[in-house]
Structure formats: structure tokens, C-alpha cells
């Protein structure tokens, strides 16, 4: 756990949250189970709030997940954010024996999971009958206090419609040129159902590289866990990063999840970027994997 400590111990007070991915395997590479890891970190580093980017709704029965989240909310004294997505990584579904239905079905399951979880947190007892998930006279005591915000991480049209209807927060990756299309789709989905867009807290994940030698900067990045998927990288200078963050702040993004390629970049971000965006809470880097979802 030295890696986590070396990252989290160096963060100033402006960094307020820690985010963990939720995967079971990528071939034979080492992957820690996300709920267990997050629970450990929440106990070991109690000054942060914690969430997942994002939990695959398929991997845990939603009624049990509601109970797990409520328990963690009490143990952490209100420091948990429930990040959910439809699930996408077929390899781990197949390897671990989970059914892998169509994308549309997984998004429908996501919507039902959120509805069921909210029922568990607010009704006592709770009953819910959906196409995919059902409960009958289920108790979730003690219920979470304070209420747990639900974040949905997605750029898919169907899942954005679910986000507009049911989520408290939304996450997708920056920079603005990547973020813009799902942002505009989410705004349109909110308009269509009459929900004020401003009710949803907007968050953005940023991949950042600020090498001392600017000629070493690569504007795109392919994570070893996501072959074939290319991420846009912010950099190479602090001014470049600040400019992109400001563009996202201008459209209402309130919270950032930062993925730094190395500790040198993290230190430069802390010293040269974070003070210039002090009006926005800038969370710590996502540790290890990035998320990608419905």
C-alpha cells in the first residue's frame, strides 16, 4: 500500500476526494477489488470523501449494494459517494460468470438499480418490482445519514437519459472537446423532462502530463488496461492545464478527478495548477485504472 500512501500523504487540503475504479480483471494483470480497496482507504485516510468511477451495477445485487453503501456511510461519518455505471468490460463478465446482456439491457438495469437503491434508503420497509430487479419488504436500517449522492459515469445516450432522470452527479472525461458532446446531450435530456440542468453536479476526469522536457509530452494516452481506447492528455505546461480546466469551469464543472502520469506531474499540479483553480475543489488523482462505461 506504499503507493497509495505516497500519493495521499502529499495532498494539500484543497484535494477533497479519492476515486477508485471497479474492475475484476484485465487478463493476468494485478487488479484489486474496488469496494474492498475503497473501504480500506476510507479507514486509513479519514480526511477524504470516497467514491468509485464507477461501480458496475451488474456485479453486486442492488439491494445488497444499498445496504453496503448505507453501512459505509455510517462508518465513514458521511464521506461516501455512490458512483454507478451500466458496466461494459465483457472479459470480466464472462470470466467471473456474470451474464453479459445487451447495452440497452444493462442501461435499463442501471436505472432499476438506482430506483431500487433509493427506495431502500427512503422506505422502511421497501418494496420494488422492476423487470430486472425486485425486493419485497426489505429493510435498510440504519438508513444513510446524510443521504448518499449518486454519481453516474457515462457518455452513452441511453445512460445519459438515466442520468438526467435519476443522478445527483455526472462524470465523464475532459478536455472540453471530449466532454462537450455528452454534456450537451445531458443538458438536452434534462430539458426534455423539465429538470433544471443545474441540479446535477458536473464532474470531469482529467489525464495530465507535465514533463520537465516538453518534447517528451504525448497529447494522447492509451492505458494498458484499455487497448484501442485513446485518451486526450492535458499539458505539457501548467498554463495549458489551467486553460483547459477554466474552459470546463466556465460551463459549470464543479469537481475534477485528476489522473497524473507520475508523481512529478502530481507535484507540479499541486504547486503550479491547483492554486490557480482554488475556487474549484480539485480531487486527488484517480489511483490506477481509469473508468469507461455505458
List PLM regions with ranges:
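N-terminal beta1-alpha1-beta2 module of alpha/beta enzyme domains
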Residues: 1-48, 148, 259-263, 287-289, ...
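Short, acidic/polar
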Residues: 1-11, 65-68, 152-165, 218-220, ...
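Hydrophobic faces of well-ordered beta-strands that scaffold small-molecule active sites
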Residues: 18-20, 49-53, 80-84, 150-153, ...
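Active-site-adjacent beta->alpha loops and helix N-cap segments on the catalytic face
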Residues: 30-37, 175-190, 263-268
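Alpha-helix-loop-beta-strand connector modules within alpha/beta enzyme cores
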Residues: 31-52, 109-116, 120, 192, ...
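Internal, glycine-rich beta/alpha segment that forms the wall or movable "lid"
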Residues: 61-166, 180-199, 288
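Active-site pocket-lining/capping segments in soluble small-molecule metabolic enzymes
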Residues: 203-238
Amino acid at each position: 500500500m506504499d503507493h497509495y500512501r505516497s500519493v495521499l500523504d502529499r495532498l494539500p487540503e484543497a484535494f477533497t476526494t479519492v476515486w477508485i475504479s471497479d474492475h475484476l480483471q484485465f487478463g493476468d494483470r494485478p487488479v484489486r477489488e474496488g469496494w474492498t480497496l475503497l473501504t480500506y482507504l476510507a479507514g486509513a485516510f479519514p480526511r477524504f470523501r470516497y467514491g468509485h468511477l464507477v461501480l458496475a451495477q451488474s456485479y453486486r445485487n442492488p439491494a445488497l449494494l444499498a445496504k453496503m453503501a448505507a453501512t459505509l456511510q455510517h462508518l465513514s461519518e458521511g464521506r461516501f459517494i455512490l458512483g454507478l455505471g451500466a458496466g461494459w468490460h465483457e472479459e470480466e463478465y464472462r470470466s467471473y460468470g456474470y451474464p453479459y446482456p445487451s447495452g440497452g439491457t444493462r442501461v435499463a438495469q442501471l436505472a432499476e438499480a438506482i430506483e431500487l437503491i433509493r427506495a431502500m434508503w427512503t422506505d422502511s420497509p421497501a418494496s420494488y418490482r422492476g423487470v430486472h430487479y425486485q425486493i419485497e419488504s426489505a429493510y435498510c436500517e440504519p438508513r444513510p445519514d446524510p443521504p448518499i449522492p449518486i454519481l453516474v459515469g457515462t457518455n452513452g445516450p441511453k445512460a445519459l437519459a438515466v442520468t438526467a432522470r435519476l443522478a445527483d452527479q455526472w462524470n465523464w472525461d475532459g478536455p472540453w472537446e471530449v466532454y462537450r458532446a455528452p454534456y450537451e446531450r445531458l443538458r438536452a435530456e434534462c430539458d426534455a423532462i423539465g429538470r433544471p440542468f443545474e441540479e446535477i453536479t458536473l464532474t470531469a476526469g482529467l489525464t495530465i502530463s507535465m514533463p520537465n522536457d516538453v518534447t517528451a509530452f504525448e497529447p494522447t494516452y492509451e492505458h494498458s488496461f484499455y487497448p484501442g481506447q485513446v485518451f486526450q492528455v492535458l499539458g505539457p505546461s501548467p498554463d495549458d492545464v489551467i486553460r483547459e480546466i477554466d474552459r470546463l469551469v466556465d460551463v459549470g464543472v464543479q469537481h475534477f478527478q485528476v489522473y497524473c502520469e507520475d508523481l512529478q506531474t502530481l507535484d507540479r499540479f499541486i504547486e503550479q495548477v491547483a492554486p490557480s483553480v482554488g475556487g474549484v475543489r480539485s480531487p486527488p488523482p484517480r489511483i490506477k485504472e481509469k473508468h469507461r462505461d455505458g
